[in-house]
Amino acid sequence: DSKILNEKRTLNIYLPQTYDKTKSYPVIYILDGSMNEDFLHLVGLQQFFNMQFKIPDFIIVGIANVDRKRDFTFHTDLKDLQKDYPTTGHSDKFIRFLGEELQPFIDKNYKTDKTKYIIGQSLGGLLATEVLLNKPNLFTHYFIISPSLWWDDESLLNKANALLSAQKDDERFVYVSVGKNEHKTMVKDADSLFQILKNSGKKKLKLEYNLMQDDNHATVLHRSVYEGFLKLYPSSD
């Protein structure tokens, strides 16, 4: 039951097979985390990586969607977007839900450490970017995949430099990825986000950019996450 969102939300939670209450675990938060969305795929990837590479055991929290167009977009005055997305513009509430309700709930009920990942694609990538620019301390690791930065005439990209310059230089990992076969605007905007982050002068910001050569918007997520983990945990040697 979320007081901020004023509705019940379903969480899908995966605990590692070796879950031990005397240890603490990093947490991955998945924005499109319904059973029929990305949750099972990403749990499977994590189990595969556990067998093949030196990757930590993660707790994985899939946030099942109710209305992603409402939750993952900020307000826009553009009439055509308001028409196509009638419930739009409540990402501020959803971000408050993440920081004030969801994370404290997970930290209270499970053995978590300070490492928190967020994985978002498309509108979820837009939301992850908004969190990175406005509430960066909510997560330590950002997987921003094919973000819908075209939203509101790219207004978030246009504000990014100013928002970044107001931030402290904290340890953070940001992975931006997009499929080469996606719409040209998606590719251009993802590249722009990476360039803005790269030129932000943040010494402790670890950045990776991946233009997925063979992927489109429908196929990009799984391979992107796989490659992102490879960049973080290269080999079991």
Can you say where each PLM-predicted feature lies in the sequence?
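Non-catalytic cap/lid and distal C-terminal segments of serine-dependent acyl enzymes
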Residues: D1-D237
